[in-house]
Regions:
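Extreme N-terminal tail/first-helix region
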Residues: 1-19
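Short Pro/Gly-enriched beta-strand edge/turn motifs at strand-loop
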Residues: 20-23, 122-124
Length: 156
C-alpha cells in the first residue's frame, strides 16, 4: 500500500468491515477490460458467499477464469469544506483476492444462502424449496489475500 499511515492491520477492524458492510464488488477478468459487479454477500470463516442467476455474463466469465478481485467499503461519509480541494471522504475499505468456487451440492447451497441471509439479519427459520435452489448459483470465495485502508476517522 502506497500510504502506510492509512493501512489497517487490526484484524478486529477488518472483520468489522467484512461483517457489517452490505455490498461487495467483484472484478472478473474479461477479454479486453475487467468486468465489475456489485453483489449482496455473506461472510463466514474468511470466506465470502454470493448468489446469482444460473445464466449471465458474470457466471460465464467465472467459468473461464475464477480468479477475482473484490472490494468492500464501509462507513463512508463525504466531508465538505469551504475550500473545494479540501473536501474529503472518511471510509474504511478493503481489497482482496481469491478464486471463486461454484457450489453444486444442494446442502452446501443452502448453507451458503443461510450465511448470506444471516449477514443481512435473518438468522433463523430459513426455508428454501428445491425449485428455488435449482434456479440459482451459489459462489464461495475463500479470501487468499487482502489489504484494508482507513481514510479519515472511518467510523462514522
Amino acid at each position: 500500500m502506497h500510504k502506510k499511515d492509512k493501512e489497517v492491520t487490526d484484524k478486529q477492524v477488518i472483520e468489522e468491515i467484512l461483517t457489517k458492510s452490505e455490498i461487495c464488488r467483484i472484478a472478473i477478468h474479461d477479454t479486453e477490460y475487467p468486468y465489475i459487479v456489485p453483489l449482496n454477500y455473506g461472510y463466514c470463516d474468511n470466506t465470502l458467499y454470493f448468489h446469482s442467476a444460473t445464466i449471465g455474463k458474470k457466471l460465464d466469465l467465472i467459468r473461464i477464469n475464477n480468479k477475482v478481485c473484490f472490494e468492500i467499503e464501509y462507513s463512508s461519509q463525504i466531508i465538505q469544506h469551504e475550500e473545494s480541494c479540501k473536501w474529503t471522504t472518511n471510509y474504511l475499505s478493503l481489497i482482496g483476492f481469491g478464486e471463486i468456487e461454484i457450489i453444486d451440492d444442494t446442502f452446501d447451497k443452502k448453507k451458503g444462502l443461510d450465511i448470506i441471509m444471516s449477514h443481512y439479519g435473518k438468522t433463523t427459520n430459513n426455508v428454501y424449496n428445491d425449485t428455488q435452489i435449482n434456479n440459482l448459483v451459489i459462489f464461495k470465495l475463500p479470501i487468499t489475500g487482502l489489504t484494508a485502508k482507513r481514510s479519515g476517522n472511518g467510523d462514522n
